[in-house]
A protein has these predicted regions:
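Electropositive, gly/pro-rich neighborhoods at or near active sites that engage anionic ligands
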Residues: 2, 16-20, 36, 47, ...
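Glycine-rich P-loop/Walker A and Walker A-like loops and their local beta1-loop-alpha1 context
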Residues: 2-35
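Short, conserved loop/helix-junction motifs that constitute active-site signature segments
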Residues: 103-109, 267-268, 291-293, 314-319
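Accessory, usually C-terminal, subdomains that scaffold auxiliary metal cofactors
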Residues: 304-373
Length: 393
């Protein structure tokens, strides 16, 4: 049995800042955001004469160096998801005192973050060598350091331990229904094995099913994504109509599409389409490495979430406008920090009817009879006229 998929190693990060800049506020905001999402975070920084826990806001007893060492010790003991030590002096002291692993090794590469004024960068290099990452003092740069590979656990952490009310398995698609919504996922292989496990899976909570998104088994992975969507794509979710891809219809630069979808030619002008089984005029999957860097925008099929290509795509298209679209897209703001600007997915209205259709082999073009395609946009996305829609239960 394989261990659950782990996010890759992250090099220790240092935020480079001007002397006197309010960098502790930046790292506190980042630490709090990670903690609110459910990640285990140990974080401290100095405010005035007092050391403070950046997650709780409570003062911490001891000298700055003592508190830094204690924070890193607790993070390692608890196998925290993130350790934040405000100020390079405290970080260096803690690492040396505890002989903490700053390179490949212990704790599966626990992300460690600190700060340093730009005039002391050489001290960072002398201490860390070539194994560290320098980070610009922006929220977006911090999330890029954190990495899109962690989006799966992020999504699962937000799912409530609710009752699973229905699991519908068809030849190519799967639906999981919870008390507040229903979610879909594409099945990457024959579903026969999954059909025999429905009773077992239905006894689990929605949160337990969502945790299967960390599985290496493709069918379990699909169950996990469907459960995630059952939580976030609520029956009463509000958004703008359509999958949102039309927002890229007037882009001046190249628009890359990962996975063709109905109405593509009417939505986008001269897109560069990448498909696993390309037709004439389309590109194979290997072309992602050449086409995504430097593109103006990318429209990405939600199936990439299930086959685990999405984190790679987000890295390759870093800095470009990105829309994640398709029936299996989780409609949650959690994905915006990982680089998505637009999220277009399905909000189910008739879960019973859709479940029956999926068992009978329905294809995505038929799903609209049982719900509505809506999209969410990141706050800083360019304005575009659209029609708001509230899904009905």
């Amino acid at each position: 049995m394989f261990q659950p998929a782990q996010a890759p190693w992250i090099n220790p990060g240092v935020v480079i800042h001007d002397a006197g800049a309010p960098v502790d506020e930046l790292i506190a905001k980042f630490a709090n955001s990670a903690a609110r999402r459910g990640f285990l975070v140990a974080a401290c920084a100095q405010r005035g004469e007092t050391m403070v826990d950046l997650v709780s806001g409570e003062p911490l007893a001891g000298t700055p160096l003592e508190v830094a060492a204690r924070t890193l010790r607790v993070a390692m003991r608890d196998d925290a998801d993130l350790a934040v030590i405000g100020g390079f002096d405290g970080f260096r002291h803690a690492a040396v005192e505890l002989t903490a692993s700053i390179g490949q090794g212990a704790t599966q590469g626990m992300p460690v973050l600190t700060t340093i004024p730009d005039g002391r960068v050489l001290e960072w290099h002398d201490f860390i060598g070539h194994g560290g990452t320098m980070i610009a003092p922006t929220t977006r740069a911090l999330w890029r350091w954190w990495g899109p590979e962690r989006l799966y656990r992020d999504l699962a952490l937000g799912v409530a331990a609710d009752e699973v009310r229905q699991i519908a398995v068809g030849p190519r698609w799967l639906m999981v229904q919870g008390p507040a919504g229903a979610g879909l996922a594409y099945l990457p292989r024959n579903s026969r094995e999954l059909v025999g496990r429905i009773a077992e899976l239905k006894r689990k909570s929605l949160r337990q099913l969502a945790e299967l998104s960390g599985s290496w088994d493709p069918l379990e992975m699909a169950v996990g994504i469907a459960a995630i969507n059952a939580h976030y794509n609520r029956f009463d979710l509000e958004g703008e109509m359509g999958n949102g891809a039309s927002a890229f219809g007037h882009e001046a630069g190249r628009v890359v599409v990962i996975g063709a979808f109905p109405g593509l030619s009417e939505t986008l002008s001269n897109p560069q389409v990448i498909e696993a089984d390309p037709r004439p005029g389309e590109y194979p999957t290997v072309a992602m490495d050449s086409l995504l860097p430097g593109c103006a925008a990318a429209v990405v099929a939600s199936s990439t979430l299930i086959n685990r290509n999405l984190p790679r795509i987000l890295r390759l298209a870093q800095g470009s406008r990105i829309a994640l679209v398709g029936p299996a897209t989780p409609l949650t703001h959690r994905l915006f920090h990982y680089g998505c600007e637009i999220l277009g997915g399905l909000v189910v209205r008739d879960a019973r009817g859709l479940g029956e259709a999926i068992r009978a082999g329905a294809l995505p073009r038929e799903f609209g009879r049982f719900g509505h395609y809506l999209h969410l946009k990141r706050e800083d996305a360019p304005a575009e006229s659209g029609c708001r829609f509230r899904a009905r239960p």
